[in-house]
Amino acid sequence: MLFRSDILKDASATAIYGSRGANGVILVTTKKGKEGKVTLNYSGTVTFETLHDVTEMMSAAEWLDYARLAKYNAGSYASATPTYEADKAAFGSVTASWKNIEKAWVNGVYDPSLVGSYDWASHGKQTGITHEHTLSASGGSDKFQGYASFGYLDQKGTQPGQAYERYTLKTSFDVTPVNWFKMGSSINASYSTQDYGYSFSKSVTGSGDFYSALRSMIPWTVPYDENGEYVRYPSGDVNIINPIRELDYNTNQRRTFRASASLYSQIDFGKIWKPLEGLSYRLQFGPEFQFYTLGVANAADGINGDGNNGAQYKNEQKRAWTLDNLIYYNKALGQHNLGMTLMQSASAYHYEMGDMRATNVASSDELWYNIGSAGTLNSFGTGLTETQMASYMIRLNYSYKDKYLLTASMRWDGASQLAEGHKWASFPSAAIAWRMDQEDFLKDISWLNQLKLRIGMGVTGNAAIKAYATKGAITGLYYNWGQNESSLGYVPSDPSQKEPAKMANPTLGWERTTQYNVGVDYGFFNNRLTGSIDAYKTKTDDLLLEMSIPSLTGYVSTYANVGKTSGYGIDLQVNAIPIQTKDFSWSTTLTWSMDRNRIDELSNGRTEDVNNKWFVGEEIGVYYDWVYDGIWKTEEAEEAAKYGRKPGQIKVKDLNNDDTIDANDDKKIVGHTRPRWTGGWSNTFSYKNFELSFFILSRWGFTVPQGAVTLDGRYMQRKIDYWVAGTNENAKYYSPGSNGEGADAFNSAMNYQDGSYIKVRNISLGYNFTPQQLKNLGINNLKLYVQAMNPFNIYKACDFLDTDLVNYDNNTKTFGSPTTLKSFVIGVNIGF
């Protein structure tokens, strides 16, 4: 139902939305009915999706070489070279798995090519098939226009046990019963069911999804013995549990119903009484609802069940609404045009939840529908969150000859989640524009179609913290009295808990960002070359972030206005039609953007906050650690010893050259979460009825916090270049087992990878049938197309991750992915 979306980047435009414009504004225009005969449209796609490995794992023989070295260095493998006896002692505790190693020992000689292996990962992926169908109808008269669509999506995931099904209903109508009044609505509703698949929680190896757990199994191990019996610990390690049967013992289902609406009515007073011409009133109301349930059942025979049937049932309800009252006044006085908008807005958000988790449920076949039969109720709880916001705004517009444009606004927002006395803030904005192409001295330039200069300033606010975050929460704590007696008490916080309460902040207020921008919109050569150039500068005061604090306070974090930041950026867009003939055309769009930010001031006059990785003069979102400088070589043994190191271990830089490595003086910023720049290039080629398009995306100069490994010879390992004395001393990674069964002391120094990439996001080929081809079928238009999604990378700096799967903002980060998804789509659009 999406018709188009517009991104507002101008400071004045985003400031109109106050706190809601803090992260930019995207205006979404949905499809509506049009005056005329009723039209019927169908669109359908079938998508084939496959899961591909990006990270290459060790083979069975490679893993054995690595594990032997790790165990030898740690003192638990008896020989510097492989022997049957040492292998038997180290890897022979499970007979069924040991046979894959034993077959490589022929007449007392080890042949790595004969090591047997089992393809665990093949059980964890499949071709995902999705089919989606949408049927829509629209039409109307001069007094009524309507639109309705129904959609259905069915998806089989790329991993067994994953599935998703969704129904959608969308309607909109606009009614004009008399020329001075109109009303309308847009309503969206959806219901979905998701089989989430298995999520491990018991074993070290099993953490994560089903496929990842299978890939984490050591390749020479087997899931079943020669009698077909399940092997729980294939390598003999109690932390590496065989996950192959888990889909039979676990259910994880989520159901969601969503509904939202946008309702309006508008009165044009000028059409009722001529002296009020230009005055109108609009009432808008937008309710939203969401009902969500989560059901999890773990059978006793599975890993998560671990001997007891377990169940969880959680439900959530979210309700929100926004009510806007708007008064518009527009007046033309000769070549002068004046406009004024007054707005009063109120919004509210309500969230409630209930969650129960239990073990010793009577039967896993009853899923989560009989938790009352549980022998142990592990946890139960309910919760309520409510927030409100009130807003007022005045905006003035002025234009002269449609060449000189001025906009000014003031908005006031009040947010309930902020502290008393700090809930309200004002957000002014102003902008001017000059349509230079309308000037007499430029009108006669034939190749100039548009040239517009824009200058703006605006203030936006951010109050995005959890409700009640300014108030101190209390935490339940059981006190023991002797051996058999305890009582429940409450304390402000317990830092030892998994999620301790945050310290109250009774002065928490708005984060305010002031932005200045200048931009140019242009169009040349009959608009065959168009685009825009925007530059902006920002300054943020009272930055609103979660801040770590010393646990000796009784807390570990609090929300705080921590300081000031500044930033700047450039956005470029170029649209061109280089070729346009009768049968062939080529259109292309190139976008490029960069932004920088800097911490100018921290609270309490500090210049750095190492715990939060905040440093005055540096960006928000940095990585601060040791600086990797290679691996100590054998001939460097004497030098390494000065630092308490030995050959085969990680070398880090002694930044202050004091012959000591310490955290206070030898760490520095080693990476940034945000890319130095982002670019995109889209192209569409049309030849007669055929259409070919592709899109390329690039993000450059950002850091992915992945790569550090624990080389203890215990768990499955990706293929790496590790240090071996005398034979591979120029390796990137340290010698396995060089720190016993633990990771190297400076292992984190290897945890930062360049995430830069250039990727082809999609390629599409379509055919549009002509009216002459369709005239005997009763069809107005027909398009068939195929599309490849995520087909390949042109370049990527990190060879073991898909770094396109990285999200970032000022305060959070996620990791790249060891797998990537590729899709092939077949689609059809039909109009009647």
Where are the regions that the model predicts?
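Short, small/polar-rich motifs associated with maturation and membrane association
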Residues: M1-K170, V178, K182-G184, N188-S190, ...
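Short, charged/polar, Gly/Pro-enriched secondary-structure boundary elements
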Residues: K32-L40, G206-F210, A463
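Asp/Glu-centered strand-loop micro-motifs enriched in Gly/Pro and often flanked by an aromatic residue
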Residues: W120-K125, R245-N252, G381-T382, D665-G671
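Extracellular/periplasmic, surface-exposed regions of secreted and cell-surface proteins
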Residues: H131, R166, S172-Y191, G197-K202, ...
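Short Pro/Gly-enriched beta-strand edge/turn motifs at strand-loop
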Residues: S113-W120, N378, D662-D665
